[in-house]
Amino acid sequence: MQGPGIVSATVAVTTIAPGVHEIDTLLGGWEHMTAGYLIDGPRPVLVETGSQSSVEVLLEALAALGLEAEDLAGVAVTHIHLDHAGGVGDVARAFPGATVYVHEKGARHLANPSRLVDSAARVYGPLLDSLYGRLDPTPSDRIHVLADGEQIDIGAGRHLVAVDSPGHAKHHLGLHDSDSGLLFAGDAVGVRLPDVGVLRPATPPPDFDLEQALTSLGRFAERRPSGIALAHYGVVPSDPAELLEEARETLQSWADEAERAWREGEDIATALGQRFAADLDGFDADKRKKLETLNGVHSNAAGFRRWLETRDSAAATSTAIPTNTATTGENG
């Protein structure tokens, strides 16, 4: 592998820890939007491919790092959203010996992505093809389902530990590097773009669940990582424990405002936009557009709305079911 930084007209690679290389995939042509991470070793593993639209940038970066077709041993995605896993099929084709690692609840969508792509097309419309691209299928015999606590062997005693972390999505997991101590957190901690510097929760539909998301942050904290590497974007220059607490407080604040608006019949997106507008004070229109494109208030509001509807519906159903202990055998 080459040295601390590789920069060209289309490639930006930074070594962020011994044997860990951050790749800027240049999603949508923006710098520092979506990262992939190569963990070096006898069995190199790529964490996150980014979108299909930026996969050529990723492949060029891997080539610049010295990887040939037979060298990559694994590709791991924290979840199957297209900005994280859209390039999996292309990368699997370019590296025919690489095993693809994914959460159990996402595996079938990598093998047959038609439903995932159709759902994304309904959400993003024309933006799907212009910003993200699609997702080519991965042969099912190349896919390995990761269980919580399972290790991906990188060789020389180094491994990545899978940490089940639903909340952002039911198919989300973190990956903890045994050597550097870095935790690759996907979107479970939120989004923090370096040129904006504001941590914002990522709560998209259809899977967002507040209780699970908060629990996942606690699970990350229990692992005591040396640093948090976000897909959006990079290693956050904060104490990991403090960052995770900030993520918890920020997520709870957004959820509280969303629920208040929901209860009072207000538009959730409008309420969130007004409540947290000050977070973006001082940033120019391009930086605001960059953040809103990746992690917009309307997307977060839709996730909160879906979560509130699901939670309230479940509570109403539970209340409506009568309890008849006489038929359970518990009374005699």
Predicted segments with their positions:
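Metallo-beta-lactamase
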Residues: 4-8, 15, 51, 71-83, 110-164, 170-238
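Conserved beta-strand hairpin/beta-sheet module of binuclear metal-dependent hydrolase folds
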Residues: 9-65, 71, 175-185
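Divalent metal-coordination and catalytic microenvironments
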Residues: 19, 39, 48, 58, ...
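Metal-dependent catalytic neighborhoods of phosphoester/phosphodiester hydrolases
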Residues: 85-95
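Histidine/acidic-residue-rich catalytic or RNA/ligand-binding cores of hydrolases
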Residues: 238-249
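C-terminal regulatory/interaction regions
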Residues: 257-332
